[in-house]
Curated annotation (Swiss-Prot):
Reaction(s) this enzyme catalyzes, per UniProt: ATP + H2O = ADP + phosphate + H(+)
GO function term, MF aspect, one: unfolded protein binding
Gene Ontology biological-process entries: binding of sperm to zona pellucida; chaperone mediated protein folding independent of cofactor; chaperone-mediated protein complex assembly; chaperone-mediated protein folding; positive regulation of telomerase RNA localization to Cajal body; positive regulation of telomere maintenance via telomerase; protein folding; protein stabilization
Quaternary context: Component of the chaperonin-containing T-complex (TRiC), a hexadecamer composed of two identical back-to-back stacked rings enclosing a protein folding chamber. Each ring is made up of eight different subunits: TCP1/CCT1, CCT2, CCT3, CCT4, CCT5, CCT6A/CCT6, CCT7, CCT8. Interacts with PACRG. Interacts with FLCN. Interacts with DLEC1. Interacts with SVEP1.
Family that this chain belongs to: Belongs to the TCP-1 chaperonin family.
Annotated positions binding Mg(2+): D97
Cited InterPro entries: Chap_CCT_beta, Chaperone_TCP-1, Chaperonin_TCP-1_CS, Cpn60/GroEL/TCP-1, GroEL-like_apical_dom_sf, GROEL-like_equatorial_sf, TCP-1-like_intermed_sf, TCP-1_chaperonin
PANTHER family, per the entry: CHAPERONIN
EC number, UniProt record: 3.6.1.-
Protein name (database record): T-complex protein 1 subunit beta
Keyword Cytoplasm part of the UniProt annotation: yes
Residues recorded with modification N6-acetyllysine: K13, K154, K181
Length: 535
């Protein structure tokens, strides 16, 4: 019987696109490697910055070297690149730092996988080798971790070193000591709770970064109303989200026709009485400070002033939420049952000047660990980048307070893990050993890139570092000030164990997900149907 020759059958809708086998894999590798190459120049203490310009009517300018910020603000179309962008975002949310490292490591793993597949090694063999390598690297990292949680002095020094290491690759590196102290003091005030919501960051143009300071209280970037007390002691605070602008008819957009101006005056009087009644209900709570998320119009403001109550309007939602947290109050919208409303409290509310701006200062708040970091700087871009840098440091410190284990930075941990994986590969038979060796090579690329970004001879430095670890000097790492190999324990270049562990596991998982892909199917775009029913 003659064999049937079938033409290829397209099972997808018109407009759908499919990439298969090698084409799909190559497309994934190229996209992921391109993302890694984009951010790798920002890695390390001598990393470079990127300028991000957004288009459109409200075009904004951003100068940053934060991996997560760069990847979040660029639009990517490649599916593998999107996987790495999402991974860096998760790294930022989980531990706050290591966003560039995790992206670069995943990209380097895929670069190695590309050359292994070219040598006809099956993706599943590579994955099996990588899984064993990840396990060995994690165990090596765990065995090198140091825990000073029980020693207060050493733990404080660890926190200072970790904050310093995190900030050394940021814009704040020139004021590292100042901001390290600020960040550590702010996190230690949390008393182990790790609730970063209690740390409020305010940015004010003017002065220099060195003028930034930590304020032991809460600052709200608003002004106190006219003819109202500017200072209140032992404050009882009602925090609300309610309309205080009932000076116009707002009943389902209704219209009112009147036959004389006297009728208009009657309507206005009724509106005023309605507002007066609402203010009286608020005052029944026994408060001396009223903070509203929405506007407070002139008439209710006068009523509050006459009652000797400080009224603060238009406190943005994030400000109100945080204020409720630190003063121990709850946000209210109705005022019929004063006994059910939880009021906030603080010892003193007063108006203060920062630069040319007036702010409201709350001191002696119910949440004792609450504080505000006031950032000063010459331009808005500097302030924004300083805030991002400080956020990374605060997140890492909060993570370290929960899990006090630390490891050494400067490429030391990566080289330690690479050495453990290489030793495992030498004991493993078959093709999996080649995959393990490629994993070790990808880990060694991180110190290589750090040295390259600093303008040093990376091949020579990494060879020296590899030799040092082979000789058993497990605290050896890159000293980027001197351009040589140094002892990280002496130099105080310390990183959080959780950050390093998350970088290793996230990068390995993301690279494995992309390596498993052998088909990319793009759905057909939705057809636009002409609208035959215009408004």
């Amino acid at each position: 019987m003659a064999s049937l020759s079938l033409a290829p059958v397209n099972i997808f809708k018109a407009g759908a696109d499919e990439e298969r086998a090698e084409t799909a894999r190559l497309s994934s590798f190229i996209g992921a490697i391109a993302i890694g190459d984009l951010v790798k120049s920002t890695l390390g203490p001598k990393g470079m910055d990127k300028i991000l310009l957004s288009s459109g009517r409200d075009a904004s300018l951003m100068v940053t070297n934060d991996g997560a910020t760069i990847l979040k603000n660029i639009g990517v179309d490649n599916p593998a690149a999107k996987v790495l962008v999402d991974m860096s975002r998760v790294q930022d949310d989980e531990v706050g730092d290591g966003t560039t490292s995790v992206t670069v490591l995943a990209a380097e793993l895929l670069r190695e996988a590309e050359s292994l597949i070219a040598k006809k090694i099956h993706p599943q063999t590579i994955i099996a080798g990588w899984r064993e390598a990840t396990k060995a690297a994690r165990e090596a990292l765990l065995s090198s971790a140091v825990d000073h949680g029980s020693d207060e002095v050493k733990f404080w020094q660890d926190l200072m070193n970790i904050a310093g290491t995190t900030l050394s690759s940021k814009l704040l590196t020139h004021h590292k000591d100042h901001f390290t102290k600020l960040a550590v003091e702010a996190v230690l005030r949390l008393k182990g709770s790790g609730n970063l919501e209690a740390i409020h960051v305010i940015k004010k143009l003017g002065g220099s970064l060195a003028d930034s300071y930590l304020d032991e209280g809460f600052l709200l970037d608003k002004k106190i109303g006219v003819n109202q007390p500017k200072r209140i002691e032992n404050a009882k605070i009602l925090i609300a989200n309610t309309g205080m602008d009932t000076d116009k008819i707002k009943i389902f957009g209704s219209r009112v026709r009147v036959d004389s101006t006297a009728k208009v005056a009657e309507i206005e009087h009724a509106e005023k009485e309605k507002m007066k009644e609402k203010v009286e209900r608020i005052l029944k709570h026994g408060i001396n400070c009223f903070i509203n998320r929405q506007l407070i119009y002139n008439y209710p403001e006068q009523l509050f002033g006459a009652a000797g109550v400080m009224a603060i309007e238009h406190a943005d939602f994030a400000g109100v939420e945080r204020l409720a947290l630190v003063t121990g109050g709850e946000i209210a919208s109705t005022f019929d049952h004063p006994e059910l409303v939880k009021l906030g409290s603080c010892k003193l509310i007063e108006e203060v000047m920062i630069g040319e701006d007036k702010l409201i200062h709350f001191s002696g708040v119910a949440l004792g660990e609450a504080c505000t970091i006031v950032l000063r700087g010459a331009t808005q871009q500097i302030l924004d980048e300083a805030e991002r840098s400080l956020h990374d440091a605060l997140c890492v410190l909060a993570q370290t307070v929960k899990d006090p284990r630390t490891v050494y930075g400067g490429g030391c941990s990566e080289m330690l893990m690479a050495h453990a994986v290489t030793m495992l590969a030498s004991r493993t038979p078959g093709k999996e050993a080649v995959a393990m060796e490629s994993f070790a090579k990808a880990l060694r690329m991180l110190p290589t890139i750090i040295a390259d970004n600093a303008g040093y001879d990376s091949a020579d430095l990494v060879a020296q570092l590899r030799a040092a670890h082979s000789e058993g000097r497990i605290t050896a790492g890159l000293d980027m000030k001197e351009g040589s190999i140094g002892d990280m324990a002496v130099l105080g270049i310390t990183e959080s164990f959780q950050v390093k562990r998350q970088v290793l596991l996230s990068a390995a998982e993301a690279a494995e997900v992309i390596l498993r892909v052998d088909n990319i199917i793009k759905a057909a775009p939705r057809k636009r149907v002409p609208d035959h029913h215009p408004c």
